[in-house]
Amino acid sequence: MLVRNKWNKKTYEVLEIENGKVTLKREDGSIFTIVQKEYITNYIKNNA
Protein backbone atom coordinates (compact mmCIF):
# COMPACT_ATOMS: atom_id res chain seq x y z
CA MET A 1 0.00 0.00 0.00
CA LEU A 2 1.26 3.48 -0.83
CA VAL A 3 0.85 6.32 1.65
CA ARG A 4 1.73 10.00 1.63
CA ASN A 5 3.22 12.02 4.45
CA LYS A 6 0.84 14.90 5.30
CA TRP A 7 3.68 17.36 5.89
CA ASN A 8 6.35 16.74 3.24
CA LYS A 9 3.97 15.24 0.63
CA LYS A 10 6.42 12.39 -0.13
CA THR A 11 5.13 8.93 -0.99
CA TYR A 12 6.16 5.80 0.92
CA GLU A 13 5.36 2.10 0.60
CA VAL A 14 4.06 0.33 3.70
CA LEU A 15 6.01 -2.91 4.07
CA GLU A 16 4.68 -4.14 7.42
CA ILE A 17 2.39 -3.17 10.29
CA GLU A 18 3.12 -5.28 13.36
CA ASN A 19 3.30 -4.97 17.14
CA GLY A 20 2.46 -1.25 17.12
CA LYS A 21 5.17 -0.42 14.58
CA VAL A 22 5.02 0.43 10.88
CA THR A 23 7.87 -0.25 8.46
CA LEU A 24 8.00 2.10 5.48
CA LYS A 25 10.12 2.24 2.33
CA ARG A 26 11.22 5.57 0.86
CA GLU A 27 11.36 6.26 -2.90
CA ASP A 28 15.17 5.87 -2.75
CA GLY A 29 14.75 2.32 -1.40
CA SER A 30 15.79 3.00 2.18
CA ILE A 31 13.64 1.46 4.91
CA PHE A 32 12.65 2.86 8.31
CA THR A 33 10.29 1.99 11.15
CA ILE A 34 8.02 4.30 13.15
CA VAL A 35 5.49 3.72 15.93
CA GLN A 36 1.94 3.17 14.72
CA LYS A 37 0.62 6.28 16.54
CA GLU A 38 3.02 8.46 14.52
CA TYR A 39 1.93 6.67 11.34
CA ILE A 40 -1.77 7.27 12.01
CA THR A 41 -1.13 10.96 12.77
CA ASN A 42 1.19 11.79 9.86
CA TYR A 43 0.37 9.52 6.91
CA ILE A 44 -2.65 9.15 4.62
CA LYS A 45 -3.47 6.59 1.94
CA ASN A 46 -2.20 7.73 -1.45
CA ASN A 47 -5.08 7.66 -3.94
CA ALA A 48 -2.89 8.56 -6.92
Language-model segment annotations:
Residues 17-20, 40-42:
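Short amphipathic alpha-helical "recognition" segments used for binding
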